[in-house]
A protein has these predicted regions:
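Short coil-to-beta-strand
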Residues: 34-43, 132-135
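Beta-alpha junction/loop-to-helix N-cap segments that form part of ligand/metal-binding clefts
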Residues: 25-28, 55-59, 73-135
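C-terminal motif of bacterial Sec signal peptides marking the signal peptidase cleavage site
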Residues: 16-20
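Flexible, small-residue-rich helix->loop connector segments that border functional cores
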Residues: 64-76
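Short beta-strand segments enriched in small/hydrophobic residues
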Residues: 38-56, 114
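Short, low-complexity, disordered segments immediately C-terminal to signal peptides
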Residues: 22-38
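Positively charged n-region of N-terminal signal peptides that target proteins for export
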Residues: 1-5
């Protein structure tokens, strides 16, 4: 029995090793098929006005700082990050609309935000429909 388990474990690690050695695709795309060229477009869906604008503005500043640092260091796999920002006005319905616009009109590869749980719940439905990851 232990010999069988050893063989299964070895086969598992061998398959992981072979997958890791595989060639990556020449063209990359996000889940909804938006191709990633020389830049990776990241949507920012934040509360920049309204009742909880302080949360959204603080997060937006942090995101901008991180993107600037990443781009200065050469980007991600040589690709620069580009931010596309939408103000959801601290409203759940507007958060959904902002995510829809970012995913469909702006063709972003991922969306960061919103900052509040109710807005995230509304935006996550859009993420599920469009296949654009929501962070």
């Amino acid at each position: 029995m232990s010999k069988k388990i050893t063989l299964i474990v070895l086969a598992f690690f061998a398959s992981i090793f072979l997958v890791a050695c595989g060639k990556s695709p020449d063209v990359t795309a996000n889940a909804n098929g938006t191709k990633i060229g020389d830049t990776i477009k990241i949507g920012v869906n934040m509360e920049l006005t309204g009742a909880v604008a302080a949360y959204g503005k603080a997060e937006q500043n942090g995101i901008k700082l991180a993107v600037d640092e990443i781009n200065k260091a050469g980007g991600v796999d040589g690709k620069k990050l580009e931010l596309v920002t939408k103000d959801n006005k601290s409203e759940n319905a507007e958060a959904s609309t902002s995510s829809t616009n970012l995913a469909i009109q702006n063709n972003v590869n991922a969306i960061v935000g919103p900052a509040t749980s109710g807005a995230v719940a509304a935006a996550s439905l859009v993420s599920q429909k469009t296949g654009v990851p929501l962070l």
